Amino acid sequence: VRAALLVAAAVLGATGLGLIWAARLAATRFLYVSELGAAGEPTAEVFRWGLVLVAVGALLVALGAAPLRPRLRWLAVVPPAAVLAGSAVAFGIASQVTCTVGCPLPVGPAFTWQDLIHTSCAVFGFAGAAFVMLQVAADRRFRALARFSLLSAIAVAVIAGVGGLLSVFRFGTEVGGVLELVATTIALLWLVGLAAFLAVSAVREGRVGTGMPRIPTQSQPNHAATPARVAATYSE
């Protein structure tokens, strides 16, 4: 069951990423990632479904993943599955409560509750996913997955950080938007990779758990240690 959930999560995550990229490529002008789903945009419906699939995929990973045990205490305070489930819920809300045209920051005269809810959920979901990356990077069992998660976390933190600063200061906004898309892509590829890796691990554990016990072979009489008369009987 766990393996099936994780395989489904990988498929949904990859499909969601594909829909987000399809929306971006179909856009006729430069847009930030969240702007693809803004009310009135022709890409809104495709982007919304893409984000929904990502949210469902993340939730399935949280439900089907084997318990992860980060080595560092501050990373083990909250179970990774719980953090990932929270991120999934946040992305699900952000997919339904989209930002307004232009996706303005929810401050000053441009403030709207819609933008505040969308921005808050998107930031919370992304931050939660980044935290899970660090938790998996400090896991004690899956070393290959830990290295993959560490590299993903560093890449997302650096790229998203630079893109976010450019967005806040309204400087090089086009570059900032591209960096935001790249960071989003890396994060979603990590989610797909996490689901696929844990699915393979679940399948292997299932095979070991259902393995048939080895039947000991029956020992045969040793003629050399048998008395002469018994040995003669066997030889006839």
Task: State where each predicted segment sits.
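Hydrophobic, aromatic-enriched alpha-helical segments typical of multi-pass transmembrane helices
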Residues: V1-Y32, L36, G40-S201
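Actinobacteria-biased recognition of intrinsically disordered, low-complexity terminal regions
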Residues: V1-A8, L198-E236
